């Protein structure tokens, strides 16, 4: 299983790269279509940043991928805009793509995915598709993807000449922070049944929404067909210096206010400024993520002391995740596959 890290600001990347090099763990660096709207990055600058940092840190032996996460289509008329984004990410050097039409019903999802996947498949690059909107609360089994649906979807793609590597599903995870009494609820037995249902096409599972999941549970993912695991909000928590529980979920008050640790992350003064902005602009709760763009210049300019403590925490936590995902030491195997 390979960890995928969503990079919303520049601060945690060095620690993740250093951990990847130390453990010989391949890693996927990714950014979602939505994140391109609330971070400083566009497709080209994202690739340039990731590649430049790997070069600067001397990574010459541990492979990494650059992934277009959640390239989302919510309705058919958005396909043209999304096709342009796929083209821009192809031109920038992205190596894998997650085409996400899961907000639509199954039939239009299949049709849109078949269409949008063509340039990715034509370029011989990696493809992830999605069935069942992540975090959905309505529909069959409260929105959970079902094995028969998954088999129908992958078979339909295959008949259309599209053979994805990974299927993202709704199996009980959410994106972002678990607030209040909500808690992590990834259904591993359902996940395994879905994986088994799509094995005739040799497709594996991509697990979204890992932030807030225990390391013990993550170690079980590989036994349930999961081969890629997305971690995003966790790195933001580290960068902002937020208090977290043992599973990496941010600790919050009843009003969804975060708790800043004075010895973690960005300077307290910068966090206070960010939170004031969030309150004034209606971006509290999960929308604090939008501070990544609004405060990009100040985040990039934090002093050495703060950058180093973010790097150190990201390094240690990335090592734990590489170990839990069983990806430590896999670099050689990946290189052998890529060069065969």
Feature-to-residue mapping (PLM):
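Hydrophobic faces of well-ordered beta-strands that scaffold small-molecule active sites
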Residues: 2-7, 27-31, 62-70, 95-99, ...
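Active-site beta->alpha loop and helix N-cap motifs at the rims of alpha/beta catalytic domains
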Residues: 33-119, 126, 133-136
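C-terminal extensions of enzymes
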Residues: 275-340
């Amino acid at each position: 299983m390979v960890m995928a890290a969503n990079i919303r600001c520049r601060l945690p990347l060095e620690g993740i790269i250093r951990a990847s090099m130390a453990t010989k763990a391949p890693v996927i660096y990714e950014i979602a279509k939505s994140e391109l709207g609330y971070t400083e990055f566009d497709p080209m600058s994202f690739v340039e940043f990731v590649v430049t940092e790997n070069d600067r840190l001397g990574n010459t032996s541990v492979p990494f991928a650059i992934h277009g996460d959640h390239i989302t289509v919510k309705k058919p008329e958005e396909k043209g805009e999304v096709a342009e984004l796929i083209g821009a990410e192809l031109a920038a050097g992205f190596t894998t793509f997650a085409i996400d039409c899961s907000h639509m019903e199954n039939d239009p999802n299949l049709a849109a995915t078949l269409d949008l996947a063509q340039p990715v498949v034509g370029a011989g690059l990696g493809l992830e598709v999605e069935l069942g909107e992540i975090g959905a609360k309505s529909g069959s089994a409260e929105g959970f993807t079902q094995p028969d649906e998954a088999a129908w979807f992958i078979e339909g793609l295959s008949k259309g000449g599209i053979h994805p590597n990974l299927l993202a599903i709704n199996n009980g995870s959410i994106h972002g922070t678990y607030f209040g009494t909500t808690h992590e609820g990834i259904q591993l037995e359902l996940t395994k049944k879905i994986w088994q249902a799509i094995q005739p096409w040799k497709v594996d599972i991509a697990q979204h929404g890992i932030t807030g999941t225990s390391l013990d549970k993550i170690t079980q993912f590989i036994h349930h067909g999961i081969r890629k695991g997305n971690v995003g909000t966790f790195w933001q928590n580290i960068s902002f210096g937020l208090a977290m529980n043992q599973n990496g979920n941010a600790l919050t008050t009843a009003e969804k206010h975060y708790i800043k640790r004075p010895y973690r992350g960005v300077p307290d003064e910068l966090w206070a400024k960010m939170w004031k902005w969030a309150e004034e602009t209606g971006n509290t709760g999960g929308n604090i993520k939008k501070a990544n763009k609004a405060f990009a210049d100040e985040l990039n300019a934090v002093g050495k002391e703060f950058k180093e403590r973010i790097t150190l925490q990201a390094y240690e936590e990335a090592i734990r995740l590489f170990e839990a995902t069983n990806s430590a030491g896999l670099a050689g195997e990946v290189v052998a596959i890529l060069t065969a």
